[in-house]
Amino acid sequence: MRRLLTLTTLLAGVPLAAPVCAEQVFSFQRAAGQLPKTVVPVSYGINISTDIDNLKLTGQETIQVDVRTPTEDVTLNQAGLHLAGAVLDNGVKATITQDDAAETATLHFPAKVSKGAHTLVITYSGPILKTPNGIYVDDYTAPSGETKRMLVTQFEVADARRMFPGWDEPAFKATFQLNVTLPKEAVAVSNMPVTQSTPEGTSQKRVSFATTPRMSTYLLALVAGDMKSVQGQADGTPLAVYAPSGLEEQGEYALHASEKILPYYNNYFGVKYPLPQMDMVAIPGNYQAGAMENWGLLTYIDNVLLFDPPNSTPRTRELIYEVVAHEMAHQWSGDLVTMGWWDNIWLNEGFASWM
Ligand SMILES: [Zn+2]
């Protein structure tokens, strides 16, 4: 009683501030964003062919879409790509307009596309960058002294659109099935396990990955190069740390950290880690993000993942544990449950940091 009286007295004595409002429950239609929500992607089948010497990629993707409001225009994101063609349901060709400043492309069809399920096939090409965003190459000095080239992706916040045209906003969740043609000697990893690897010509191979769960575009990832791994498991989930060949043993500490952290999080969140594997990769050098929580393929700049007992300090060991725990927390906070728009990224980051 006294507390209530005290509060009443206090409230009577000060001008009332604006009421505190909880945010509304998420609704896809209300979620902020720049793309129209008339057409929504359901699944992407992405085929890319990479030329890492000439820094070019060509792609063809098949997107299953759900048309929610009949429309003649389908607008999606692209950045730096050239869309060569877009065909709906095996026949209807679109006229394509690109707005490079807005990072979009609009596919204009001769008649309204009806409500419901449709298939969109887009062919395109674009650059592979040398700067660490979108799909890019990372040139580094290998332990052998040779200069080597790694193919890396970094999509958060809005650079998935540099690898494939799509609805590159976090609320547009869909499944992804990725197929990549790359040098035959490269080891390639993505969010999901490899399902098939077949030779292409004399110097390349085509690697296919299993279909992801529904997720946001910014969490898709691909890394390929001269890598080796150390492997373990926890709670039935295979775990691995990949590093440039010759450095993989330095991934042991992070691997053992992940083996302790995964069962703890499975129990803490009450939802078992839902992907069939969790890989972590050390990117040598050219990786501005520091570390990134791509779902099932966590990427780190090498000095926050690799621990070399004779040369690394105890502080490095602590830092590795901290960063691994942070990125693994994102597998739930951010990846499984994602903010509708970037204004709520604090929730992703705040929770992962708190864990
Ligand atoms: Zn984070």
Swiss-Prot record:
Active site: E327 (proton acceptor)
Entry's EC annotation: 3.4.11.2
GO molecular function: alanyl aminopeptidase activity; metalloaminopeptidase activity; peptide binding; zinc ion binding
Presence of the UniProt keyword Protease in the record: yes
Signal peptide stretch: none
Residues binding Zn(2+): H326, H330, E349
Co-factor remark: Binds 1 zinc ion per subunit.
UniProt xrefs under InterPro entries: Aminopeptidase_N-like_N, Aminopeptidase_N-like_N_sf, M1_APN-typ, Peptidase_M1, Peptidase_M1_aminopeptidases, Peptidase_M1_dom, Peptidase_M4/M1_CTD_sf
GO CC, alphabetical: cytoplasm; extracellular space; membrane
Recorded family membership: Belongs to the peptidase M1 family.
Identification of the protein by name: Aminopeptidase N
Originating species: Acetobacter pasteurianus (Acetobacter turbidans)
